[in-house]
């Protein structure tokens, strides 16, 4: 009964395959959107149930010898508790003898449907009456012994040994290639080295439901801990470890929560410490934090209604809004004492600050919201939610910056009015601004030359940027990954396969699956594909079954049945136990109806066939054809052009793999980010031009963001940074946030050109520095995330905002000074920005 390849029962290992679930933000709503790849992930998990298995490895330490008993005891106990918990459809650590015999009956009693061309002659020989007599005589002396009940039962189920023929070409049940079914008490899922025993369970709900997955894994871990607490179990040294899709789901949810807590805490604490250093009075500090605090609170309230639940990327809005919260209110705090110093009352100073700075604040919030709103148009759902929530947050902060904070300032000053203008300004920042601007005043041409040189050099190297091909959500030290690696090492059960998902009526699905299997077989023979698991090894199409049966059309099965009866009597056997097989031979001799899915389900164990092909609620069928590449890191195991040609030849199907889904997701994010970049750039250009009504002024206002974006990518290239798809997503944010520097500085300069750009830069500089520092801290907190794309966005945005600050505080004054120096006798005509 030996064989090699991928026999039907080896598809039991297919139900074991781990399918890492796509990131979910709720039990029913995919983060990725509605593209075919992502619909396929949902269909595989929900309708087909494919990959929704929980594995539990029962292992013993290396060097232990007699541990079979404790392993079986632990596996039996946990399996029994699973079945009574109400959380699992079925759970098993082996096959019952009757299940094994039913598999034999399924293939032996329907042998015309499974006999291939290369097996036809051997089967005909076994059906020959003379050969039947010889086989029965041999069975009487070799197969049936007082110590071989399985041999006896096997002989009763398949007295002609037809299953042995099918097994030679990978159609037998004996080769559970990953298990040693003969070790221990028998029929158990032991590893080949006998050091591990596997429990395979199918929970009631999909692994893509994070809440249910957490419940299942928590239940499993609790029961394992209770077993570990017992002295007898603890002394045995047996180790029990859950693995598979449900463990990945649980770990990813914990991963999300851990990352959000970490980056939010870093952003909030970092900005709080920064504000404590900068603001001289506690009430002023509290007022500066008010827009961020209320903005986060109100935005969270909106998000609770829509989208209802958020994902890892969109949850980062807490850290980002904590950094953006005081970006505009600091300009009020900076402007009010300056206006008060000109004379008049404090209330007059506040009103003048509103009249001058208020419009700039409004413009800056609108430009930032333009960038986030452009991301909200993304077809990639996670990015769209991120953009939407940030846009809501920006408008919430605008409301509190323009209305709530001034109102509270008025109330505060009724009880504690400042005695001098300088008591409500900043610490340290005016000194830093003066030093920077004085340097620009002394070396304007040097600053411009350095900025232009850096810009040009970065621009030259931009075409060499390459995006990373993939990213991993979890690392090798993650418990889910470690458990999956042990599962692979012990049982050869790999990670996520490539899957062709086929839908339609039953025979259409099976026919297409056979054609695709034949196409994949060529790649397996060339060594590109390691293994193929097709539903048609368990259930061939009716057409294939008829073709195979036709090759046996000349065999007189009625004569074979008579010969079997006679030989049984001649050798002293009772015919009653074998009568079902004899009757089946006679029926097959009269007619051979094709095997159906319902027939297969009656004979095969739960989880064997229904995870390969299943009837869905609307009466159609869904089948999963899975295969593994020889190179585990290969993404295009089968070229896209070949898959497209197969679709034209064989009909529609969905190609699915988490590696491909990863790549498609990155391509989608890149596409959406480029579109958001175009919309943001167009919106910002329009807003800036409508605000200043002068092309030359508009170009000067744009200096910080152009320098910031190009310089960021140039510097990262210089240090050989590996870019990911989220680098492009950061560009609209740099544009929307970095433009604030140019708007505030140039508008202030236009109001008081007679003071000169250096004086204006010194007056505006402290607010520019403070607003950018809090933003850098907010986005910089994302770099603490262990989710690589989020950390990438934090790095690129933080560096971009820092360079945009340099462009605003250094380059804009330097450019204006250089222009003034070129026309000292006609400054009004050359530098008049009106």
Language-model features: where?
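Signature of alpha-helical transmembrane segments and their immediate interfacial
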Residues: 1-25, 407, 411, 415, ...
């Amino acid at each position: 009964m030996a064989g090699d390849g991928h026999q039907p029962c080896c598809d039991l290992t297919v139900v074991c395959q781990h399918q890492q679930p796509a990131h979910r933000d709720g039990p029913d709503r995919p983060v990725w959107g509605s593209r075919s790849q992502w619909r396929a992930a949902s269909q595989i998990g929900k309708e087909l149930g494919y990959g929704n298995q929980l594995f539990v490895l029962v292992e013993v330490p290396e060097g232990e010898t007699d541990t079979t008993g404790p392993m079986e005891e632990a596996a039996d106990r946990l399996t029994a508790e699973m079945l009574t918990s109400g959380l699992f459809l079925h759970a098993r650590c082996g096959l019952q003898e009757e299940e094994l015999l039913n598999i034999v009956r399924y293939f032996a009693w329907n042998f015309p449907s499974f006999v291939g061309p290369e097996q036809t002659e051997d089967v005909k020989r076994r059906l020959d009456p003379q050969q039947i007599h010889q086989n029965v005589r041999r069975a009487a002396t070799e197969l049936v012994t007082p110590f071989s009940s399985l041999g006896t039962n096997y002989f009763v189920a398949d007295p002609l040994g037809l299953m042995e023929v099918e097994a030679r070409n990978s159609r037998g049940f004996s080769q559970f290639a990953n298990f040693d079914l003969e070790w221990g008490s028998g029929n158990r899922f032991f590893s080949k080295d006998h050091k591990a025993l596997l429990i395979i369970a199918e929970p009631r709900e999909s692994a893509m439901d994070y809440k249910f997955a957490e419940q299942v894994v928590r239940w499993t871990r609790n029961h394992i801990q209770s077993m570990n607490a017992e002295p007898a179990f603890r002394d045995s040294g047996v180790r029990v470890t859950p693995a598979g899709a449900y463990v990945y789901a649980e770990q990813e949810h914990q991963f999300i929560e851990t990352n959000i807590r970490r980056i939010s805490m870093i952003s909030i604490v970092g900005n709080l410490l920064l504000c404590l250093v900068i603001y001289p009075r506690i009430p002023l500090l509290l007022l500066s934090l008010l827009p961020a605090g209320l903005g986060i609170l109100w935005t969270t309230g909106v998000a609770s209604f829509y989208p209802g639940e958020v994902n890892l990327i969109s949850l980062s809005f807490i850290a980002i809004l904590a950094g953006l919260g005081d970006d505009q209110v600091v300009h009020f705090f900076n402007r009010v004492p300056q206006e008060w110093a000109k004379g008049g009352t404090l209330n007059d100073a506040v009103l003048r600050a509103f009249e001058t700075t208020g419009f700039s604040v409004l413009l800056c919030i609108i430009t930032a919201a333009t960038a986030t709103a452009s991301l909200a148009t993304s077809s990639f759902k996670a990015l769209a939610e991120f953009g939407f929530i940030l846009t809501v947050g920006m408008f919430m902060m605008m409301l509190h910056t323009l209305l709530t904070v001034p109102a509270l300032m008025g109330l505060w000053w009724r009880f504690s009015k400042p005695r001098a203008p300088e008591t409500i300004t900043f610490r340290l920042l005016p000194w830093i601004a003066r030093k920077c601007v004085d340097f620009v005043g002394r070396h304007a041409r040097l600053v411009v030359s350095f900025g232009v040189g850096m810009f040009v050099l970065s621009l030259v190297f931009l075409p060499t940027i390459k995006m990373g091909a993939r990213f991993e959500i979890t690392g090798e030290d993650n418990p889910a990954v470690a458990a999956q690696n042990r599962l692979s090492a012990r049982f050869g059960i790999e990670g996520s396969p490539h899957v062709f998902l086929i839908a339609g009526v039953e025979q259409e699905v099976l026919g297409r699956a056979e054609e695709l299997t034949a196409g994949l077989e060529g790649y397996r023979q060339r060594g590109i594909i390691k293994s193929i698991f097709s539903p048609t090894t368990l259930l061939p199409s009716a057409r294939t079954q008829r073709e195979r049966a036709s090759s046996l059309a000349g065999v007189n099965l009625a004569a074979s049945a008579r010969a079997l009866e006679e030989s049984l009597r001649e050798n002293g056997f009772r015919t009653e136990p074998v009568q079902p097989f004899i009757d089946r031979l006679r029926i097959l001799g009269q007619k051979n109806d094709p095997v159906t899915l319902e027939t297969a389900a009656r004979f095969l164990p739960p989880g064997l066939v229904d995870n390969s092909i299943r009837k869905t609620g609307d009466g159609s069928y869904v089948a999963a054809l899975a295969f593994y590449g020889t190179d585990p890191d290969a993404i295009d195991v089968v070229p896209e052009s070949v898959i497209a040609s197969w679709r034209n030849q064989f009909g529609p199907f969905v190609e699915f793999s988490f590696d491909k889904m990863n790549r498609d997701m990155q391509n989608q994010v890149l596409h959406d980010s480029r579109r958001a970049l175009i919309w943001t750039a167009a919106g910002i250009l329009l807003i800036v031009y409508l605000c200043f009504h002068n092309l030359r002024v508009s170009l000067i206002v744009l200096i910080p963001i152009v320098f910031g974006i190009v310089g960021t990518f140039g510097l990262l290239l210089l240090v050989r940074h590996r870019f990911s798809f989220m680098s492009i997503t950061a560009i609209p944010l740099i544009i929307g946030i970095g433009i604030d520097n140019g708007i505030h500085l140039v508008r202030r300069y236009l109001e008081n050109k007679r003071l000169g750009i250096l004086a204006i830069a010194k007056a505006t500089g402290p607010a520019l520095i403070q607003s950018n520092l809090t933003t850098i801290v907010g986005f910089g907190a994302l770099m603490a995330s262990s989710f690589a794309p989020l950390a990438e966005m934090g790095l690129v945005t933080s560096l971009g905002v820092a360079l945009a600050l340099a462009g605003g505080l250094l380059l804009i004054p330097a450019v204006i000074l250089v222009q003034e120096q070129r026309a000292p006798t006609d400054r009004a005509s050359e530098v008049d920005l009106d």
